Amino acid sequence: MENPMVSQAEQLEQFRDYLHLLARLQLRSSVQVRADASDIVQQTLVQAIRGLEGFRGKSEAEMAGWLRQILARQLANLVRDQACQKRDISREQSLEAALDESASRVTAFLAGGDSSPSQKAVRNEEVLRLTHALAGLPEAQREAIVLHHLEHRSLAEVSLELDRSTAAVAGLIKRGLRELRVRLQAST
């Protein structure tokens, strides 16, 4: 007989790359926070596993939203701890809103609108496939794509951030997008 907690924990694991991308986007935009996104995602998943019995959602979208809330709390705790301040609920809420915006940017990267529950389910599956495919790219390509397409930075800004020429960044993005297409087609 299958242990339902194991299958739920495995289900949580499929969101690791998605959460990692969201955490990286938030950490990059927060000047005052210097931390590793992988550590924060690990803490988020540990908290989620501990709270699985209390999760009442039924869809992947509800699971993703619940995990974003846990991630927002982890980031708020990190900001609080690093700033040695008392807990600021407005900051936690603004982090949660920023995470929702980051999630929207990832979803918007996949063109199209959601008009039915089945379309939303397909979209959520595509977002997970995209984040898994992004995670498998070489780091330089992944960084260039995230900065340019998800953070909407110009090629010049990305080239400064990555300390590469604009032509080199354009090449990274072109090769990365080509590889993303291959990976996404292979995963269907």
Predicted regions and their residues:
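Hydrophobic/aromatic residues within well-ordered alpha-helical segments
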Residues: Q11-L19, L67, L71, L137, ...
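Short, charged helix-capping/linker segments at alpha-helix termini
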Residues: E2-Q14, L21-Q43, K58, S165-T166, ...
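DNA-recognition helix of helix-turn-helix
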Residues: L130-T131, E139-Q141, L147-L150, L155-A186
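Short amphipathic alpha-helical interface segments enriched in basic and hydrophobic/aromatic residues
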Residues: H20, R24-R28, L45-E53, A72-C84, ...
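Amphipathic alpha-helical segment used for protein-protein interaction
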Residues: L19, D100, S104-V146, R153, ...
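Structural recognition of an alpha-helix C-terminal capping motif at a helix-to-coil junction
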Residues: A35, D39-V46, A61-R73, G171
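Short alpha-helix-to-loop micro-motif enriched in aromatics/charged/Gly
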Residues: L52-A61
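Arg/Lys-rich amphipathic alpha helix in sigma70-family domain 2
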Residues: G54, Q69-S94, A98-E101, R123
